[in-house]
């Protein structure tokens, strides 16, 4: 990674990384991990750094000051080695509330799974409302729910095309996100050039959904 990035001026790209909280064995290794990440990337700072995967499994460890995770990462931000500090949430709204009550005033963004299926199914609506109350911008992962929203049952696709004949089915998921002012960043996994070109075409226009849609 470092060799690839070294070809470009540091200010010409954004670089994000995360503390791997999915493994509880990492909780006492924040300094070791962070320094190794910087070294691997060959940079002096990260533009964005996340407390990764805040969920039921690790919330107690994240909140345990004995591990020193928050204190260390906040200190790195104060030194300019992290430009923006945030977190990704994979658990319930209640878990997010616990994390925010402890660290919310220092969080600059939050990444959640958000799409029109999980709006109700995983209470993404409630999570967006919670982040809005804290004034924290929303980053989106799984906008197409692993590709499941890129193609629908024929009858459902027909309903969408009746409303927007020129709109790709997958684009509806992105138009839904464009309807939410809290959303500032959308992360979309793309496996080929065609998908990249379609996403670029979709986001070249701002066409949020109307009420009836």
Describe each PLM feature range.
Residues 11-23, 49-51, 112:
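A short, structured active-site edge motif that brings together acidic residues
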Residues 54-213:
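Beta/alpha (TIM)-barrel catalytic core signal, keyed to glycine-rich beta->alpha loops juxtaposed to Asp/Glu
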